[in-house]
From Swiss-Prot:
GO terms for biological process: positive regulation of translation. Required for accurate and efficient protein synthesis under certain stress conditions. May act as a fidelity factor of the translation reaction, by catalyzing a one-codon backward translocation of tRNAs on improperly translocated ribosomes. Back-translocation proceeds from a post-translocation (POST) complex to a pre-translocation (PRE) complex, thus giving elongation factor G a second chance to translocate the tRNAs correctly. Binds to ribosomes in a GTP-dependent manner. It comes from Anaplasma marginale (strain Florida). This is Elongation factor 4. GO terms for cellular component: plasma membrane.
Amino acid sequence: MVGESTIRNFAIIAHIDHGKSTLADRLIEACNALSDRDMKDQVLDSMDIERERGITIKAQTVRLTYAAKDGVVYHLNLVDTPGHVDFSYEVSRSLAACEGSLLVIDSSQGVEAQTLANVYKAIENDHEIVTVLNKADLASSDPERVKSQVEEIIGLDASGALLISAKTGMGISDVLEAIVHRLPAPVGDANAPLKAILVDSWYDPYLGIVILLRVKDGVLKKGMKVAMLSTGAVYQVDNVGVFTPNKQMVDSLSVGEIGFITAGIKEIADCKVGDTLTEDSRRCDNPFPGFRATCPVVFCSLFPVDASSFEHLREALGKLQLNDSSFTFDMESSTALGYGFRCGFLGMLHLEVVQERLEREFDLDLTATAPSVVYRVTDKHRVTKEVHNPNDLPESHEILGVEEPWIAATIMVPDQYLGSILALCNSKRGEKVDLSYTGSMALLKYRLPLAEVVFDFYDSLKSVSKGYASLDWYVDGYVPTEISKLTILINSEPVDALSCIIHKSKVESRGREICERLKDLIPRQQYKVAIQAAVGAKIVARETISPYRKDVTAKVYGRDVTRKMKLLEKQKKGKKRLRSIGNVNVPQSAFIQALKMKD
């Protein structure tokens, strides 16, 4: 058991690619937590996708032992948090487990939107914040400009900001000294009933469900019976341990310590991030504030390209859900694509990561339908239900009203790109809330429909700003809207996989776009193929694929016009009969390309 006066719990918060995981590597190296043989880049990022994309997806923790210059040995608990907006709830719960934060900012890039969002979460949790300016060895580094941004935009005193290079190791000893002397020790009562916050959970093939937690009060011991306050579920603790970053079993965790337990838990859904864990026989009175169950906000359907892979896909989704309780899936069927699953995600990055993991780790070939958001639909009987699948949307005469989710977005961009960003936001039905300037940077606040953002808003934002704009957002309630179900017909047959829910103002343009794309993708047939976009009985767009035409009059010599007319009439009847009995063979690649929606 460790005395709380020598414990420091801290998180590293930063925008994507500002050097957060690299700094964690240098701290682990400086504290000799791993041998040279075991040390690798982004040691806390366990997934290949995390390393390749340079992002952190799952919150990770490591206990480091540091002998400070004052002769005291400190125990540092580092929580490496995700930086992307999709995982912002994970960040807020990780920050609730700490007393301080290292605010890492790229000294050449400056403050960005997600830096802002995460530092405000740290301030809400009463964190002591140490500002660290990374990449100070670069020629483009401008520490003074970034310090003034920190003071003007965030409102923190940047006079004590540390200049470091996580890549070369410059200034790492200063960071460690700042952690032990500038960040506070945890406060708690070891004699009070056990109270611990659940930071993360995942599935381990040997240990079962592993819970990462921080003890606030009391002592957590092996063999203790513990209860989850949100679900009331009771378990007996089998193992208690810490990450150094390798697993190390211990007898107990006391006030301020961060570690893991296993307790024979079978379902990851029982372990909700942010939940309070307490001793069953002596429960704490009040749970940690701010707990909420994470709900998917973006949905799409995943179908295996090879129908025989359906069971393999079901198993793969089940395994991913063991590590990610915010991800949901339900079976569905499509006449065009066969059997698949309707999946729910926290955002577009979450969707991309899950799809990439399915394809890479489980060797699956998948078709994904267009992403959709959750609409609240009130029917004429005044019954409200949530709809995210176009096939579940009632007919227009059955609908009394519809509400769609809107987001509050914060965009930071150099002022020379402001005009393009404003035009982009307005084209997405956005409403400007605020605009302020700090030096050459514009801080823009907008409200936007989530349905407009999930398609390609982030890509368009980066494109019009040459990659300089940064975005942070959160769902900010529901707003009444007018939507339509756009149905795609091929030779008068509806294709359910291409149906989508769209705002009424975008119906014609989106319908025309899909029809034009399908015209290029569907092979020509022996007969004419009509591709139509419809809303109810009204056709809003149409494209026609011309048939192949065999020259049946080639063998007719001379000027026998009646013979030619007879052959042409016979060909016309044959094509008419062929059209009535023939199905248009739409290749799988056509669905995939048609569903890659771009404005």
